[in-house]
Amino acid sequence: MPSEKTFKQRRTFEQRVEDVRLIREQHPTKIPVIIERYKGEKQLPVLDKTKFLVPDHVNMSELIKIIRRRLQLNANQAFFLLVNGHSMVSVSTPISEVYESEKDEDGFLYMVCASQETFGMKLSV
């Protein structure tokens, strides 16, 4: 099975910067987030999309619930959202704060989802 290209591999830096500019212009209260499955992940299903526009008032626990629902995970299935491939942030942190401190130079906030088996490893996005 060929490995899936990441969002950064599919879009040039210039395209991503323009994407963010248009998103922020059209949706000033939304945070542009890219969520991809950790490349070595075996337990979690693949998300049906990678680009999310998250309302800026949402906290991390709400985002986790949304992604769990999209993945159709059971309550007992382990699931972690890692910011920039390595940071776990408090579930009470508003996404707007995470965005300001962790956004990429292209303007997107990158996250990877992983099951417990990858917890604690440095992940590359």
UniProtKB/Swiss-Prot annotation:
Annotated source species: Homo sapiens
Propeptide positions: 121-125
Superkingdom classification of source: Eukaryota
Described function: Ubiquitin-like modifier involved in formation of autophagosomal vacuoles (autophagosomes). Plays a role in mitophagy which contributes to regulate mitochondrial quantity and quality by eliminating the mitochondria to a basal level to fulfill cellular energy requirements and preventing excess ROS production.
Location of the protein in the cell: Cytoplasmic vesicle, Autophagosome membrane; Endomembrane system; Cytoplasm, Cytoskeleton
Recorded GO MF terms: microtubule binding; phosphatidylethanolamine binding; ubiquitin protein ligase binding
Biological-process GO terms, alphabetical: autophagosome assembly; autophagosome maturation; cellular response to nitrogen starvation; mitophagy
Name of the protein described by the UniProt record: Microtubule-associated protein 1 light chain 3 beta 2
Main subcellular location: membrane
Signal peptide positions on this chain: none
Lipidation (Phosphatidylethanolamine amidated glycine): G120
Family annotation (SUPFAM superfamilies): Ubiquitin-like (SSF54236)
One Pfam short name: ATG8
PTM comment text: The precursor molecule is cleaved by ATG4 (ATG4A, ATG4B, ATG4C or ATG4D) to expose the glycine at the C-terminus and form the cytosolic form, LC3-I. The processed form is then activated by APG7L/ATG7, transferred to ATG3 and conjugated to phosphatidylethanolamine (PE) phospholipid to form the membrane-bound form, LC3-II. During non-canonical autophagy, the processed form is conjugated to phosphatidylserine (PS) phospholipid. ATG4 proteins also mediate the delipidation of PE-conjugated forms.
GO cellular component annotations of the record: autophagosome membrane; cytoplasmic vesicle; endomembrane system; microtubule
